[in-house]
């Protein structure tokens, strides 16, 4: 399963760990992904989404129906 938020499009970023001595080692910054079921009243069913914590806040603000239409407009089947 890919580590990509379906709402915001956030994906892992790469960077460096920096020690006190300024040694650098490569690392990945992973998004805060959660799997969450949302009740969609218009479809009378649950929809299971893998999204970041920021994606959940966007759904709280805009509503699940509005976000689902945006996702489906991008060609993702839900």
Swiss-Prot record:
InterPro entries: Ribosomal_bL28, Ribosomal_bL28/bL31-like_sf, Ribosomal_bL28_bact-type, Ribosomal_bL28_sf. Signal peptide: none annotated. The lineage of its organism: Bacteria, Pseudomonadati, Pseudomonadota, Gammaproteobacteria, Alteromonadales. Keywords: Ribonucleoprotein, Ribosomal protein. The gene is rpmB. The keyword Ribonucleoprotein applies. It comes from Pseudoalteromonas atlantica (strain T6c / ATCC BAA-1087). It comes from the Bacteria. This is Large ribosomal subunit protein bL28. Pfam families: Ribosomal_L28. Transmembrane segments: none annotated. GO terms for molecular function: structural constituent of ribosome. GO terms for biological process: translation. PANTHER family: 39S RIBOSOMAL PROTEIN L28, MITOCHONDRIAL, LARGE RIBOSOMAL SUBUNIT PROTEIN BL28M. One of its GO terms (cellular component) is cytosolic large ribosomal subunit. Gene3D superfamilies: Ribosomal protein L28/L24.
